């Protein structure tokens, strides 16, 4: 049975902390396949400074090239509009019948899982991998995996704000992503 990890997020933009999460999960679980799953629109997030999806996909590919593993699952992008993880996982599972699916979330998402659409069915389809960046270890449900990672206080919101203020984002994102953001004039206003 194949072990497949799905790491969802807006990735607007993808940054160094996302890379750390991906790397820690990849090396801990050693999956057969690892997918970044960019959302078109998350039902539980604000959509400020929304850029063209192609820019996000390009930056994710840059991260994949740098990490040396991973692929992009663009199911939610193709579907457009608001995407629910349940619908995405259900469709993905139909394409990957003989697979164990692992879905990466942060403690912030873990704490609001009960708000997720069809969460009880979703829990039956995937094993949640809860990534914790706090000092204290995370207590999770028995059917979930908790992975402690180094705390890195970087957010996509912070990066967008720094760019709009003309501040440096060096080391917050890989050089390739920094150059891309500057070259395309992303997040400048």
Swiss-Prot record:
Pathway: Cofactor biosynthesis; NAD(+) biosynthesis; deamido-NAD(+) from nicotinate D-ribonucleotide: step 1/1. It catalyses: nicotinate beta-D-ribonucleotide + ATP + H(+) = deamido-NAD(+) + diphosphate. It comes from the Bacteria. GO terms for biological process: NAD biosynthetic process. CDD domains: NMNAT. SUPFAM superfamilies: Nucleotidylyl transferase. It holds the Pfam family CTP_transf_like. The keyword Transferase applies. Its EC number is 2.7.7.18. The keyword ATP-binding applies. It is an enzyme of class 2 (transferase). NCBIfam families: nicotinate (nicotinamide) nucleotide adenylyltransferase, PRK00071.1-3, PRK00071.1-4. Belongs to the NadD family. Catalyzes the reversible adenylation of nicotinate mononucleotide (NaMN) to nicotinic acid adenine dinucleotide (NaAD). This is Probable nicotinate-nucleotide adenylyltransferase. It comes from Staphylococcus aureus (strain bovine RF122 / ET3-1). The lineage of its organism: Bacteria, Bacillati, Bacillota, Bacilli, Bacillales.
